[in-house]
C-alpha cells in the first residue's frame, strides 16, 4: 500500500513540475504580422519579427522607404483592394487567433494642368490623375492670330497630343499662335499687308495695310504751307494720330492764302481720312517710317502698283516742309508742302 502511494506521489510531483515549467504536451498558439507592398515600385516592405499570441497588442509599423510611382502611401489595410480594415501607422490593434497580412494602401496622385494662352483668352486649369489624359479645352482666341495648338514649352517646339500623352506631374501647356496675315498678303480691305508688328497685337492694331493702287491719288499738296501745325511724329504707329492732327487743323483753319480753306478736302491727309473702301473707313496718311515700310516691303518686291515718284507722309518737318519719299530709290526728303505728289492711304488693324 505504501509503495502504491509513493508511485502516485511521484506522478503528481512530476506533473506539477511539468505544469510549473510549461513543458506540457499542449503549446500556446502564436501568430505573425506580415506586411505586403501591394504593387510598390521601390523600397522594401517593413518586417515585424515579433511572435504574437492571441489578444496581444500589435503596433502598426511605418512604411519605411516603400514607394509606388504616381501614388501616395495612405496606411495599411487588411485587404489588398482596400476594402478591409484600415490601420494607420503607429496605431494599435488586438490580434486574434490567426496570422494577419497588412497591405499597403495607395492613393493615386492628382496633378494640376495649367494652360498658358500666351496673350490669348483665358483657359481654365484641369485636375488630372496620375497617368490620365488631359481633356482638350475649347480653343482660345487672340486678336490678329490663329490658334495653332498646345505645346509642352513656351517656345512651342513639342506639341501635346491629347490622344496619347499622359500626365505624371503638374504641368503647364502653352498656346501657339500664328499671324493671320504675313507680309504682302491681301488684307481684309483688299490692299496689301506691309507691316506685321513684332510684339503682336497691342494698342488696337497689329498689321498695316496699304490701300489698293486703284485708290491712289496724284498731284496732291500736303497743305498748311507757311504754318507749323506741330504734334506729328515720324515713327511706326504715329500715322493715324498725325492724320487726325492735320485734318483737325484743316477743318479749323481760316487762312486761305494757299488755298487750304477752299481746297482742304483735296489735301493729302484729308483725302486719306475720308476714304471708304469695302466698308472700311479707318484710313490715314502714313507717317515717315510707315511710308518707308511700304516702299521697303511692297515697292521693292514689285507689288502694290506703286510708281517711282514721290509719295507724301503725314510727318511734318517745318512750317514749310513735310517728309516725302522717292519710290524709285527709297530716298526720304523733306519737301515744300505746296508741292504736288502722290498719296497712298493705309490702315492699321
Q: Which residues fall in each region the model found?
A:
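Secondary-structure capping and domain/repeat boundary segments
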Residues: 3, 25-179
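Short, compositionally biased
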Residues: 23-27, 109, 176-278, 328, ...
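Short, polar loop/linker segments at the starts of domains and inter-domain junctions
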Residues: 41-55, 84-91, 121-134, 158-166, ...
Amino acid at each position: 500500500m505504501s509503495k502504491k502511494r509513493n508511485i502516485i506521489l511521484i506522478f503528481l510531483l512530476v506533473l506539477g513540475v511539468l505544469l510549473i515549467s510549461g513543458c506540457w504536451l499542449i503549446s500556446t498558439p502564436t501568430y505573425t504580422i506580415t506586411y505586403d507592398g501591394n504593387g510598390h515600385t521601390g523600397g522594401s516592405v517593413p518586417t515585424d519579427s515579433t511572435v504574437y499570441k492571441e489578444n496581444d497588442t500589435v503596433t502598426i509599423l511605418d512604411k519605411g522607404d516603400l514607394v509606388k510611382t504616381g501614388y501616395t502611401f495612405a496606411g495599411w489595410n487588411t485587404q489588398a483592394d482596400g476594402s478591409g480594415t484600415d490601420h494607420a501607422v503607429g496605431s494599435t490593434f488586438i490580434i486574434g487567433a490567426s496570422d494577419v497580412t497588412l497591405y499597403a494602401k495607395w492613393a493615386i496622385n492628382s496633378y494640376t494642368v495649367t494652360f498658358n494662352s500666351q496673350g490669348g483668352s483665358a483657359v481654365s486649369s484641369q485636375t488630372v490623375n496620375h497617368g490620365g489624359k488631359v481633356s482638350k479645352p475649347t480653343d482660345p482666341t487672340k486678336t490678329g492670330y490663329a490658334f495653332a495648338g498646345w505645346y509642352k514649352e513656351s517656345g512651342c517646339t513639342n506639341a501635346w497630343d491629347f490622344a496619347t500623352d499622359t500626365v505624371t506631374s503638374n504641368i503647364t501647356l502653352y498656346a501657339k499662335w500664328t499671324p493671320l496675315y504675313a507680309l504682302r498678303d491681301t488684307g481684309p480691305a483688299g490692299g496689301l499687308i506691309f507691316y506685321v508688328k513684332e510684339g503682336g497685337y497691342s494698342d488696337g492694331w497689329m498689321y498695316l495695310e496699304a490701300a489698293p493702287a486703284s485708290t491712289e491719288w496724284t498731284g496732291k499738296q500736303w497743305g498748311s504751307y507757311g504754318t507749323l501745325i506741330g504734334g506729328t511724329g515720324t515713327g511706326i504707329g504715329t500715322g493715324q494720330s498725325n492724320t487726325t492732327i492735320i485734318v483737325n487743323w484743316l477743318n479749323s483753319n481760316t487762312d486761305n492764302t494757299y488755298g487750304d480753306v477752299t481746297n482742304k478736302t483735296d489735301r493729302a491727309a484729308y483725302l486719306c481720312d475720308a476714304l471708304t473702301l469695302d466698308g472700311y473707313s479707318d484710313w490715314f496718311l502714313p507717317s515717315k517710317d510707315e511710308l518707308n515700310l511700304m516702299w521697303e516691303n511692297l515697292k521693292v518686291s514689285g507689288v502694290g502698283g506703286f510708281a517711282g515718284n514721290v509719295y507724301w507722309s503725314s510727318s511734318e518737318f517745318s512750317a514749310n516742309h513735310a517728309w516725302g519719299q522717292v519710290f524709285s530709290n527709297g530716298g526720304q526728303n523733306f519737301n515744300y508742302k505746296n508741292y504736288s505728289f502722290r498719296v497712298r492711304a493705309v490702315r492699321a488693324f
